[in-house]
Amino acid sequence: MSIEQTFSIIKPNAMKKNAIGDIVSMFEANGLKIAAAKITVLTTAKAEEFYAEHKARPFFGELVSFMTSGPVMLMCLQGEGAVLKNREIMGATDPKKANPGTVRAKFGDNVGENAVHGSDSPESAARELALFFEKHEICNV
């Protein structure tokens, strides 16, 4: 496997639980390094742009509302096979179905408020990273 970059969001519900340190420790313990990070509150426009693929879905409005409800932590994670590794660390989308010890099993509340987002492919990672970070903001760690 090669060194990759992937995009990750710690969502508002996990931020409210003060879970940043625990979640970042899980990434680092599994060989992922933080190449960029920022804490912000997403605007409605940015959340709608990020989740544009879900615009026609019935949950879109609720998703945008949740993602703009409080601070999020945006990260570029880097490491060997980072996209897949991050998805394994996160666990299943539904926290009830996530393996014990995964981020979503520990900090997710339900399918919508599942603590974290992670890119599902290298192509998605590139698109998502470009949406939130300038090239000069991402370090090669």
UniProtKB/Swiss-Prot annotation:
Subcellular location: Cytoplasm
One cellular-component annotation, GO: cytoplasm
Catalytic activity, as annotated: a 2'-deoxyribonucleoside 5'-diphosphate + ATP = a 2'-deoxyribonucleoside 5'-triphosphate + ADP; a ribonucleoside 5'-diphosphate + ATP = a ribonucleoside 5'-triphosphate + ADP
One of the protein's GO biological processes: GTP biosynthetic process
Principal location class: cytoplasm
Entry EC no(s): 2.7.4.6
GO molecular-function terms, A-Z: ATP binding; metal ion binding; nucleoside diphosphate kinase activity
InterPro entries the UniProt entry points to: NDK-like_dom, NDK-like_dom_sf, Nucleoside_diP_kinase, Nucleoside_diP_kinase_AS
SUPFAM superfamilies noted in UniProt: Nucleoside diphosphate kinase, NDK (SSF54919)
Keyword ATP-binding: yes
Magnesium found in the keyword field: yes
Names of the cofactor(s): Mg(2+)
Enzyme kind, highest EC tier: transferase
Record keywords: ATP-binding, Cytoplasm, Kinase, Magnesium, Metal-binding, Nucleotide metabolism, Nucleotide-binding, Phosphoprotein, Transferase
Active-site feature positions: 117
Binding residues for ATP: 11, 59, 87, 93, 104, 114
Record text on subunit structure and interactions: Homotetramer.
Entry similarity comment: Belongs to the NDK family.
Function (record text): Major role in the synthesis of nucleoside triphosphates other than ATP. The ATP gamma phosphate is transferred to the NDP beta phosphate via a ping-pong mechanism, using a phosphorylated active-site intermediate.
Entry-linked PANTHER family: NUCLEOSIDE DIPHOSPHATE KINASE (PTHR46161), NUCLEOSIDE DIPHOSPHATE KINASE DDB_G0292928-RELATED (PTHR46161:SF3)
Protein name: Nucleoside diphosphate kinase
Organism in which the protein naturally occurs: Bdellovibrio bacteriovorus (strain ATCC 15356 / DSM 50701 / NCIMB 9529 / HD100)
Gene encoding the protein: ndk
